[in-house]
C-alpha cells in the first residue's frame, strides 16, 4: 500500500475513486446520442460567436457543448467522488444513496452532508437540509454535524446560521435557524477535520491531476468521448455539402418547426 499522491489515502483507494468518476463521465457523455444532443435545441448564434471569438474549431466547440450538456450530472458525481474519498479515510464510512447521511465517523461523533458547490442549494432546500442535519444532532448528542460545501466562497468552519421564510410582523425579520452542533464547513476545513492534516485539501488539489494522468496511462483509458457524435455529424454534413455549423442549423430549427427551415 503506497501513498504517492496523498498522505491520508492509499494510491489504490484514490485510484478506485478516480475510476468511479471516470466511469460516470463516460456514461454521461456516451449517453448523448444524436437525438439527445438536439433535444433542448442548440443556440446556433452563441455557437457562431463562441467559435469565432474564442477561435474554436468545430470539434472543439462540439466537445465544449457536450461538456455543458452534462455539467449538472457531472457536478453531482464530483460531489460523490469526495464522499467516496472521505469514506476511505480510516475511521470514516461513506454511505450510499438511500441513507440519511453521506459520511459518518464510525464512532458516531461526526455526520456530514456533502455538496460539491456553494450554490447547489437554494430557498426551501436549504431549510430542509438544515432540519435533516439537525435530526442527526438530536439523535446523537455527542456528534458534531456538518453541511460541507467542497467548493465554497471562503474557508469556513462555523455554526450554520441563516434566516429563511416569511418576515415576522413584530421583528420585521425572517425566522432564524441555528443549532449549536450543526456547522457549515468548506472543503479545505472539512478535509482538515477528517484527516487531521492542515494541507489535506491542498494535497488533493495539486495531486489529483497527476494521479488522474497516471491512472489513465495505467488503464490505457481514452480521453474525450465526443468523436463518435462528431463523426456522425461530420459525415452527414459532408453528404449534404454543408459545413458542420450549417448542418447543426439545418437539424436544430426544423425540430421546433421554425419558419422557413
Curated annotation (Swiss-Prot):
Its EC number is 3.1.21.4. The keyword Acetylation does not apply. Keywords: Endonuclease, Hydrolase, Nuclease, Restriction system. Pfam families: RE_Eco47II. One of its GO terms (biological process) is DNA restriction-modification system. It catalyses: Endonucleolytic cleavage of DNA to give specific double-stranded fragments with terminal 5'-phosphates. The keyword Nuclease applies. It is an enzyme of class 3 (hydrolase). One of its GO terms (molecular function) is DNA binding. Monomer. This is Type II restriction enzyme Sau96I. It comes from Staphylococcus aureus. The lineage of its organism: Bacteria, Bacillati, Bacillota, Bacilli, Bacillales. The gene is sau96IR.
